[in-house]
Swiss-Prot record:
Signal peptide start-end: none
Task of the protein: One of two assembly initiator proteins, it binds directly to the 5'-end of the 23S rRNA, where it nucleates assembly of the 50S subunit.
Similarity remark: Belongs to the universal ribosomal protein uL24 family.
Stated name of the protein: Large ribosomal subunit protein uL24
Gene that encodes the chain: rplX
Organism: Synechococcus sp. (strain JA-3-3Ab) (Cyanobacteria bacterium Yellowstone A-Prime)
């Protein structure tokens, strides 16, 4: 597993190569894809099940439908307009979710297998269900 660089290592890279690398240019290996069904395993929304709407590999976060709902109080932008309260999903860290099998109704870790035709596919470790 590749570990993310520490800030001191990034500064050393910049000095050695002369190339400016920003910390946010690092990308994490995401085992969860858009459209996957996941279950939240920790935090305020523990136990909730939802579909992944978006993946953010630079921040190692995912946006899950119906999870981590935040409320925004918006001021009126124009004269005569009234303020409003908006709610929407906010991203959560990828380590807080596990893939969920709808057939077996169980959350599981992810493994990888190579099929007979040479494709690398994701597999649920508990059930053996192939995802890709």
């Amino acid at each position: 597993m590749v570990r993310p660089l520490k800030p001191s290592q990034i500064r050393r890279l910049i000095r050695q190569t002369g190339v400016r690398k920003h910390r946010n240019s690092l990308r994490y290996k995401m085992r969860i894809k858009k459209g996957d069904t996941v279950q939240v395993i920790s935090g305020d929304d523990k136990g909730k099940i939802g579909e992944v709407l978006q993946v953010f590999p630079e921040r190692n976060m995912v946006l899950v439908e119906g999870v981590n709902i935040v409320t925004y109080h918006r001021k009126p932008q124009r004269e005569g307009e009234s303020g409003r309260i908006e709610t929407k999903e906010a991203p959560i860290h990828a380590c807080k979710v596990m893939l969920y099998s709808k057939k077996q109704e169980v959350a599981s870790r992810i493994g990888y297998q190579i099929t007979a035709d040479g494709r690398k596919v994701r597999v649920l470790k508990k059930t053996g269900e192939i995802l890709d």
